[in-house]
Amino acid sequence: MSQNSSFSDIFEDGCDLTYDPLPENLKYLTQLFYMVPGIIIHFRILSIMLFQHRKIYMIQSFFIIFSMDSIASLTQLILDLFIQRVIIYIPQLCPSLYPLFEHYVLFPNIIFSIYNYMRAAKSIIQIFLTVNRMTCVLAPLRYSQIWRRFIPVTIAFITLSPFLVIWNVIISETFPVSIFGGFTLAYTKRVRWASLSMFQMIFMAISLTITVFTTSITLFKMRRLENRLKSSERTLCFASFYMSAAFFSAALFQSYFAFFSITAAYTDLVYFLQGFAFDVLNVGSPIVMVLISGQLRYHVIPVKSMAPKHSTVVSVTSVIRKT
């Protein structure tokens, strides 16, 4: 098998039978502890938005975009929990699964492509979420009209633009490489200069820049609203800070594989931290949204204490509607 990618030059072939499986199994159990609740929350949110309360959420552009983000996060979490993290952190399965992933190349290529497609999509989705909030504050009277015409273009752009990131993965060969006693997936880079890590990092850097810019404008404009909206401003500030910090940390680790000289001594650690950074993003995004939107919080947890109060503004959209 031709292994001409820089990624494959760092990792070794085959299973490392000298690795102690217990610490790796504990890593998987730890990740299982927060991934399962994350998957459940995403399923709950999507069932509410797409089915139970579709007439409420699917007429609002912000929640249409967020539902796409939730689908992307959910897909990544499912692939991580049942495939990616299993083959990495359960070394006992490596001797059986490694040959299958090595010889049946179509399956790992599909998994690898879908996973990185969703990762790229999240960067684009983040841009539209923050632009949507900014538009709501800058043009409250024309906000709904603008996004009613713009949302089909938004959906198409979110759907198609990730192919700019993964096109080289699709046409290249995917293969297993050893890591943490198990193995992960790499690709040969048929087009040598088209690095997946570089494309991913570029997308995330653009997303982070636009997020900071649009959120700053949104917060500046919100300061002119009534004092009763100060709690909403603090909530939005927290949400924006969280999303920006999560994207920044993920982009930082992405840049390690994209641009810096990498050695085996540090690659395992950075690979682990990179996965954790994306976990924070995928698991944290629905939690942040539930904290922001009182209506969504009440639908997710239908108890009276969670019901939104009329005097409390919990989202940018509701801020404009109540002023």
Curated annotation (Swiss-Prot):
Organism from which the protein derives: Caenorhabditis elegans
PANTHER family reported in the protein's UniProt record: SERPENTINE RECEPTOR CLASS GAMMA-1-RELATED (PTHR31627:SF13), SERPENTINE RECEPTOR CLASS GAMMA-RELATED (PTHR31627)
Superkingdom of the source species: Eukaryota
Location relative to the cell: Membrane
Protein name: Serpentine receptor class gamma-5
A GO cellular component annotation in the UniProt record: membrane
Biological process (GO), any one: sensory perception of chemical stimulus
Membrane-spanning intervals of the chain: 31-51, 63-83, 98-117, 151-171, 193-213, 245-265, 272-292
Similarity remark: Belongs to the nematode receptor-like protein srg family.
Membrane topology field: Multi-pass membrane protein
